[in-house]
UniProtKB/Swiss-Prot annotation:
Annotated positions binding Na(+): 72, 75
UniProt keywords, alphabetically: Cell membrane, Ion channel, Ion transport, Membrane, Metal-binding, Sodium, Transmembrane, Transmembrane helix, Transport
Protein name as annotated: Fluoride-specific ion channel FluC
An annotated Gene Ontology molecular function: fluoride channel activity
Length: 122
């Protein structure tokens, strides 16, 4: 039961932060940059914590709270998919392609960057 509570509190916090960040960061050049930003931030955190957990003994509960709850709610694959599809539907093929490319390569890069930053501590 404790695990569900931790995931729920983390999820609530991540969802609220996603709402705030997406509201603050406007669409730039027709690309939904708020969604991109939350996905990049979440990917960095996951990369950092997953690598750190190999060396620090970060508890399973803490990882549930941060990675499953907080980052799971902060990041949003469904919104990214919807926004990319919406751009395609409006015949903004290049903008949709840029959105897809920047989200996928950016998030993978942020996982790597988070891991590299973490490795500098351990």
């Amino acid at each position: 039961m404790k695990e569900y509570f931790l995931i729920g509190i983390g999820g609530f916090t991540g969802a609220v932060l996603r709402y705030v960040i997406s509201g603050i960061i406007p669409v730039k050049f027709g690309i939904p940059t708020g969604t991109l930003m939350v996905n990049l931030i979440g990917s960095f955190i996951v990369g950092f914590l997953m690598y750190s957990s190999l060396f620090t003994g970060i508890s399973y509960e803490y990882r549930l709270f941060i990675i499953t709850g907080f980052c799971g709610a902060l990041t949003t694959f469904s919104t990214f998919s919807y926004e990319s599809f919406s751009l395609l539907e409006q015949h903004y093929f290049i903008k949709s392609g840029i959105n897809i490319l920047t989200n996928v390569t950016g998030c993978i890069s942020m996982i790597y960057f988070g891991r590299m930053v973490s490795s500098s501590f351990w």
